[in-house]
């Protein structure tokens, strides 16, 4: 068993628009408070649930006051609060109340048993990297954003291919005609990048992966770069091109706009139950190691 720091103040964050989430959140809050921990709620979560009987704090207030945030929802909920709490180094515990759950790894059915043990110091800790991006137009930055999973440049559904000029560390890599380009962290390598035939990067691997989306030339392949790389993507052709960050914020781009992407100085601490295995998560979520059907055996 790995014993870490015991926490005192615990923030609860939920996917507030999800039906049926109020009861498990209230139950978890009572379970944690009963064991002597101070409980606070993220403000939007508290507002959606109505009166919780606990203090309601903004993400900035959680960062300043809470020792740890427990997130009940899907991966999207974890991504959103992770970006907001990244400057404060607030550790996150993820409880899966969504569908896939690559980064919310505790089943909701186990939370009342597992979470109190973790809050008491029995957990495994890892740091996850983020990307920071800015859009430059006419030599002036017009937009900044953090991304936990990925920065995605893509065309709209009814426009033609985007034409992109990609440089790394000031050196020209290629011009690409495609539906877009994904710049992903190791965490994001199991998201959109994976569905576009990108490689899986272990979360502790120091890398950034570039994955073309439906490229015109079959020779355009994914590439893994060192995570200190500085990536520049210039729009040199196409129309209705957009950029999104974790699929949660979107910005329209113009011809000659440049998206500059690099590793953020911030990392997000993830806490896992003792015995956590990333490979077990992959095996379960991607259905690895499943046996052939009996029908195949009978042939």
From Swiss-Prot:
It comes from the Bacteria. The keyword Phosphoprotein does not apply. It catalyses: NAD(+) + ATP = ADP + NADP(+) + H(+). GO terms for biological process: NAD metabolic process; NADP biosynthetic process. GO terms for molecular function: ATP binding; metal ion binding; NAD binding; NAD+ kinase activity. Pfam families: NAD_kinase, NAD_kinase_C. Its EC number is 2.7.1.23. NAD(+) binds at residues 75-76, 149-150, 177, 179, 190-195, 214, 248. Keywords: ATP-binding, Cytoplasm, Kinase, NAD, NADP, Nucleotide-binding, Transferase. It is found in: Cytoplasm. Its cofactor is a divalent metal cation. One of its GO terms (cellular component) is cytoplasm. Involved in the regulation of the intracellular balance of NAD and NADP, and is a key enzyme in the biosynthesis of NADP. Catalyzes specifically the phosphorylation on 2'-hydroxyl of the adenosine moiety of NAD to yield NADP. Belongs to the NAD kinase family. PANTHER family: NAD KINASE. This is NAD kinase. The lineage of its organism: Bacteria, Pseudomonadati, Pseudomonadota, Betaproteobacteria, Burkholderiales.
């Amino acid at each position: 068993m790995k014993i870490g720091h015991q926490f005192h103040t615990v923030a609860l964050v939920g996917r507030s628009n999800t039906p049926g989430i109020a009861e498990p959140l209230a139950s978890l809050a009572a379970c944690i408070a009963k064991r002597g921990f101070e409980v606070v709620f993220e403000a939007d979560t508290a507002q959606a649930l109505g009166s919780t009987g606990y203090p309601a704090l903004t993400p900035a207030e959680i960062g300043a006051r809470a020792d740890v945030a427990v997130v009940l929802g899907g991966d999207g909920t974890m991504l959103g609060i992770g970006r907001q709490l990244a400057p404060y180094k607030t550790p996150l515990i993820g409880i899966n109340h969504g569908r896939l759950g690559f980064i919310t790894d505790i089943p909701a059915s186990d939370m009342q048993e597992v979470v109190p043990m973790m809050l008491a110091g029995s957990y495994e800790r890892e740091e996850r990297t983020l990307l920071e991006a800015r859009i430059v137009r006419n030599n002036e930055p017009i937009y900044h954003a953090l991304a936990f999973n990925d920065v995605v440049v893509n065309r709209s559904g009814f426009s033609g291919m985007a034409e992109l000029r990609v440089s790394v560390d000031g050196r020209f890599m290629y011009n690409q005609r495609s539906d877009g380009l994904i710049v992903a962290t190791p965490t994001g390598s199991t998201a959109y990048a994976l569905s576009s035939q990108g490689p899986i990067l272990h979360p502790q691997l120091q890398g950034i992966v570039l994955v073309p989306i439906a490229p015109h030339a079959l020779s355009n392949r994914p590439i893994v770069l060192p995570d200190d790389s500085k990536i520049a993507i210039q729009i040199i052709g196409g129309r209705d091109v957009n950029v999104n960050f974790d699929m949660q914020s979107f910005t329209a781009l113009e011809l000659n706009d440049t998206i500059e992407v690099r590793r953020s100085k911030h990392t997000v601490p993830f806490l896992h139950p003792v015995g956590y295995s990333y490979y077990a998560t992959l095996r379960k979520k991607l259905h690895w190691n499943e046996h052939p059907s009996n029908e195949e055996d009978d042939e």
